[in-house]
């Protein structure tokens, strides 16, 4: 019964793995819900900031703020690449990296260089492995990242845009659609589009005249930074919800596969045990007949 013992050992090993994947599935489900709640709470803030910023930009057209400049000749681009810090989330990071690398290659074909800020260790390791120009990074952000953890890398990139050392900034992340679907997204963060500060931007439902302190221009300059930071944080929350959803689905599939493997191993074990018993009975019968 040496074979039978080996099969039982395999069954116990798969059962232990199944317990781990089941626990990870439950943890990911809980984390996904919490991340979705944070996303919902952050949206109203971002919308209000955008609305006030749009009003100020339209009433102060000669603001002279570099972050609100548009129509630049593209010579150098920046990327904010958001990925997860951990694996076991299916093809989530691979899909984001595929979209990101395709855009990088397209720019390189036009002779345009790139500078990259990586948020998440998976993206950082991928960029370093192929020799891309990573200028700043933030990794090990945890399940509830603070904005302060992102300010250093983001400020580096925004300052380079203000100095005209970068002419466009892309934001790349995995967008959360639903539990079963996450899609890689790439958005132009800078220059800020007409849908944010132009005539097509969302308007306040009130037509009051606002008075700003110390000045409208100072408030606008402050809000532009807060708006950009809120967009990046929203994308990070989106990516984290996608990560937990993808991990939940992957761990459920692993748990189900482990269950199927256990059934197959039990079937093999029962067959081998039955064969061993049949052999023993045959030997007993043969021995009795010989007597």
UniProtKB/Swiss-Prot annotation:
SUPFAM superfamilies: ATP synthase (F1-ATPase), gamma subunit
Pfam families recorded: ATP-synt
GO molecular function, one term: ATP binding
Chain segments annotated as transmembrane: none
A GO biological-process term: proton motive force-driven plasma membrane ATP synthesis
InterPro entries per UniProt: ATP_synth_F1_ATPase_gsu, ATP_synth_F1_gsu, ATP_synth_F1_gsu_CS
Keyword annotations from UniProtKB, A to Z: ATP synthesis, Cell inner membrane, Cell membrane, CF(1), Hydrogen ion transport, Ion transport, Membrane, Transport
GO cellular component term of the entry, any: plasma membrane
Cellular localization per UniProt: Cell inner membrane
Membrane topology field: Peripheral membrane protein
Sequence similarity: Belongs to the ATPase gamma chain family.
Quaternary structure annotation from Swiss-Prot or TrEMBL: F-type ATPases have 2 components, CF(1) - the catalytic core - and CF(0) - the membrane proton channel. CF(1) has five subunits: alpha(3), beta(3), gamma(1), delta(1), epsilon(1). CF(0) has three main subunits: a, b and c.
Function: Produces ATP from ADP in the presence of a proton gradient across the membrane. The gamma chain is believed to be important in regulating ATPase activity and the flow of protons through the CF(0) complex.
Cited HAMAP family: ATP_synth_gamma_bact
Protein name: ATP synthase gamma chain
Lineage, highest ranks first: Bacteria, Pseudomonadati, Pseudomonadota, Betaproteobacteria, Neisseriales
Designated gene of the protein: atpG
């Amino acid at each position: 019964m040496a074979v039978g013992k080996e099969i039982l050992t395999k069954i116990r090993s798969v059962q232990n793995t199944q317990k781990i994947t089941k626990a990870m599935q439950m943890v990911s489900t809980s984390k996904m819900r919490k991340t979705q709640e944070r996303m919902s709470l952050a949206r109203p803030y971002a919308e209000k900031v955008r609305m006030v910023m749009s009003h100020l930009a339209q009433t102060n057209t000669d603001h002279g703020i570099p972050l609100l400049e548009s129509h630049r000749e593209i010579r150098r681009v920046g990327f904010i690449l958001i990925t997860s810090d951990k694996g076991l989330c299916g093809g989530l990071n691979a899909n984001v990296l595929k979209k990101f690398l395709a855009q990088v290659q397209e720019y390189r074909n036009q002779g345009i260089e790139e500078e990259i800020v990586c948020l998440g260790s998976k993206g950082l390791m991928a960029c370093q492995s192929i020799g891309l120009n990573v200028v700043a990074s933030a990794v090990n952000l945890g399940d509830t990242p603070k904005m302060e953890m992102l300010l250093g890398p983001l400020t580096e990139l925004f300052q380079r845009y203000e100095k005209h050392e970068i002419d466009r900034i892309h934001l790349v992340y995995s967008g959360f659609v639903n539990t079963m679907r996450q899609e890689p997204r790439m958005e132009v963060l800078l220059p800020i589009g007409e849908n944010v500060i132009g005539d097509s931007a969302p308007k306040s439902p009130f037509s009051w005249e606002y008075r700003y302190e110390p000045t409208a221009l100072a408030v606008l300059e402050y809000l532009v930074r807060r708006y950009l930071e809120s967009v990046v944080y929203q994308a990070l929350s989106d990516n984290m919800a996608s990560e937990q959803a993808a991990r939940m689905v992957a761990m459920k599939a692993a748990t189900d596969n482990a269950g199927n493997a256990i059934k197959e191993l039990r079937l093999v074990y029962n067959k081998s045990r039955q064969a061993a018993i049949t052999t023993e009975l045959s030997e007993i019968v043969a021995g009795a007949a010989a007597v």
